[in-house]
Amino acid sequence: MTVLIIGMGNIGKKLVELGNFEKIYAYDRISKDIPGVVRLGEFQVPSDVSTVVECASPEAVKEYSLQILKSPVNYIIISTSAFADEVFRERFFSELKNSPARVFFPSGAIGGLDVLSSIKDFVETVRIETIKPPKSLGLDLKGKTVVFEGSVEEASKLFPRNINVASTIGLIVGFEKVKVTIVADPAMDHNIHIVRISSAIGNYEFKIENIPSPENPKTSMLTVYSILRALRNLESKIVFG
């Protein structure tokens, strides 16, 4: 597999380290050269690339996606908070209808998306509570505090780098059905996501406590491995979930 990785932060570097690729291209505006990686000076999708992996930012998703959709590639997107922008979301999916590309949204920092996608037509509401250390939200607080309650769209304006989980859920069931609570807790040294699903099929609750990456406490290693799983599934004859 020949890949183009957008973003050479902690996630991108881990993919290079742990992935099994024939050739790796990378596009990153600030990263230094990495051994074994062909760094692109300007953004493009080389003709030999079969898969594009975005692990940079919601801004990168908005800036490069429409160009990527012109190529016959598998496009894996992790910064799904870009889709909280309704204007961009509508344009993206409009372009995708006639695109030769296929788009994949990994589960990222949570689980249970197989359940959610299976019953999406019957879902009434999804409530997601995210508990984070205040510093990861750019806050300095002394006690546990609810810092936000509301819609995914509203949350994305205040915490654009912390809404990927909620945005992925919104892409599955519809953003209007998702309610977000963000809690800052100084006692926490990791992130917790609690997802509560109410549906005509059943009610479900998932609690995910992620251990931060040693290199970047803001990143969950589960996110890295969910991307690696998505990459493996592209070539595997057996797929679970």
Curated annotation (Swiss-Prot):
Catalytic activities: L-aspartate + NADP(+) + H2O = oxaloacetate + NH4(+) + NADPH + H(+); L-aspartate + NAD(+) + H2O = oxaloacetate + NH4(+) + NADH + H(+)
Residues noted as binding NAD(+) in the record, renumbered to the chain: A109, N164
Annotated GO MF terms: aspartate dehydrogenase activity; NAD binding; NADP binding; oxidoreductase activity, acting on the CH-NH2 group of donors, NAD or NADP as acceptor
GO biological process, one term: NAD biosynthetic process
Keyword Manganese: no
Annotated SUPFAM superfamilies: Glyceraldehyde-3-phosphate dehydrogenase-like, C-terminal domain (SSF55347), NAD(P)-binding Rossmann-fold domains (SSF51735)
Top-rank taxon: Bacteria
Biochemical pathway: Cofactor biosynthesis; NAD(+) biosynthesis; iminoaspartate from L-aspartate (dehydrogenase route): step 1/1
UniProt EC number: 1.4.1.21
InterPro entries, alphabetized: Asp/hSer_DH_NAD-bd, Asp_DH, Asp_DH_arc, Asp_DH_prok, L-Asp_DH, NAD(P)-bd_dom_sf
Alphabetic keyword roster: NAD, NADP, Oxidoreductase, Pyridine nucleotide biosynthesis
Record-annotated active site: H193
Top-level EC class as recorded in UniProt: oxidoreductase
Entry keyword Cytoplasm: no
PANTHER family: ASPARTATE DEHYDROGENASE DOMAIN-CONTAINING PROTEIN, L-ASPARTATE DEHYDROGENASE-RELATED
Biological role: Specifically catalyzes the NAD or NADP-dependent dehydrogenation of L-aspartate to iminoaspartate.
Note, other: The iminoaspartate product is unstable in aqueous solution and can decompose to oxaloacetate and ammonia.
Similarity section: Belongs to the L-aspartate dehydrogenase family.
Name the record gives this protein: L-aspartate dehydrogenase
Top-level taxonomy: Bacteria, Thermotogati, Thermotogota, Thermotogae, Thermotogales
